Amino acid sequence: LYDADQGILLSGDHVLPSITPHVSGVGNGADALKSYIATLDLVADLPGVRLGLPAHGHPFEDVPGRVDAIKRHHEERMHLLQQVSSSLGAATVQQLSREIFPKKHWGVMAESETFAHLEHMVLAGEAERREEHGRLLYEVAPPS
């Protein structure tokens, strides 16, 4: 919800000031991460945004800058998946997630976000998914 006259964006959980919103890959089979990034771009393109009002945390001023930071976070997460996959080889979502979130395992949230990144990379041709013995295994292409 955006009040263009006042430059105030009710960003809810979509853009948060200090944490990245959870992107779940569980759903209708679409590329959840690609969809989320596309909507972030729409928010960044809103003219004259002065203030973001999030569902969590304090109001914040640099909405386009925060959008850029969230997008960078997801790029960094995919780069980390490339690194982890190169050392593990083909692995399950759970195995990859535990490597990416080693200090504090966030359980299902971490796994569903890892799944969203992996599925995005599969659809972009940057990773492969296969089934072996009833388990989905992912292998991410090394950085080019």
Indicate residue ranges for each PLM-predicted region.
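Metallo-beta-lactamase
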Residues: 1-78
